Amino acid sequence: YPLRRQRQMCIRDRNNYYKLMMSILKETDPDVMKKIFENFFVNGNLVGWKKQEEYRKKYNCNIPWAVLLDPTSACNLHCTGCWAAEYGNRLNLTFDDIDSIITQGKEMGIYMYIYTGGEPLVRKQDIIALCKKHNDCQFLSFTNGTLIDEEFADAMLEVKNFMPAISVEGFEEATDGRRGQGTFSKVVKAMEILKRKHLPFGISACYTSQNIDSISSSEFFDQMIEWGARFVWYFHYMPVGNDAATELLPTPEQREYMFHQIRKMRMEKSIFAMDFQNDGEYVGGCIAGGRRYLHINANGDCDPCVFIHYSNANIHDMSLLEVMQSPIFMAYHDGQPFNDNHLRPCPMLENPEKIKEIVEKTGARSTDLQSPESVEHLCGKCESYACNWTPTANKLWEERQEEKRQKKQQQK
């Protein structure tokens, strides 16, 4: 029983995961811990999964595990290379809009809701009110962290089902360089408040060609642990938007370094690390298009992915189930996985011909209302990257398959 042996080893050796679990148990508010267990583990992964499977079979379409949505396109910062900034800053989903999305989602077994933006905490009061109304759901928000204060942390303690993932770019120089002078100190203050009040939170980090060494260093992992973060979610820079800086795309050598470094840190540091782009092997490739999540922007447009702003569905005009049956979402359903090598999972970044075909076939339009980007322009920025990454991805993929074969042989 491999999993049982791993659990026994974790306890016996007092390894990094043992330390992580012990710190979570000892340092998290017990009522918050109980609510996370009920909403995330029981509702989101046991009760909800059964309902989702029923809908998948009945309607022959994707049903997501989580819904990402933008309460607002407004933000108090303007970060370099931010895909969300492309939407402008005057759009909002009303309280009733979000309430309806969540209500519909729960009917299909969806209990996980993730706020993006814009800066979601511009809508603090509505976010807390939604947590109260839907106290059987787990809410997470990607946030720059600058609007987290004592009062909001107390509200988090009251509702118990809200968790922030705070965006940082590394240490002070890198964070302030991309997010604005003084941002880092505000973020550190927010994390101090959360840690003091025994509220769990994580880190969201975007790696680029410019920050990849510092943001993945052992020292940075130690700093995140010191801040009190329980997880870190790494995102590969995406060249989305007409003005995207393609020079920020990591080189194949840098991405390969991240592939190995994150796996190394997982075995050494007491924080759970995820890499949205390089961990495709654990989730069967692309999870967008409603396979595990979709994205609803502040205008109500339903994008298959938070990074792919094309759609022919709007939540104001159709139900959530109808969105999942719309042309672009069905194209994802029918086309996934987009590559058998799950280190090349994305129909845009690593397989740009796929998203071009999907958009043209389904007649999807750009949902970027401020500066619409043609799919040809988007794909043109990815073609060279995809070509350069393919040999490295194929090498790594074959090595991983061989490792798995050898491990399976040893367990016989």
Residue ranges and their predicted role:
Residues 1-3, 7, 11:
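Single conserved hydrophobic/aromatic residue that forms the stacking wall/gate
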Residues 4-5, 176-289, 298-299, 303, ...:
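Radical SAM enzyme [4Fe-4S]-AdoMet core and its adjacent flexible, acidic
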Residues 10, 75, 79-82, 286, ...:
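Short cysteine clusters
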Residues 15-68:
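N-terminal [4Fe-4S]-dependent radical SAM core
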Residues 43-64, 274-276, 280, 314-330:
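Short, charged low-complexity linear segments at domain edges
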Residues 60-62, 66-95:
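Canonical Radical SAM [4Fe-4S] cluster-binding loop centered on the CxxxCxxC motif
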Residues 95-115, 121-235:
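Radical SAM/AdoMet-radical enzyme domain recognition
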Residues 307-412:
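Flexible mid-to-C-terminal extensions adjoining Fe-S/redox cofactors in radical SAM and related proteins
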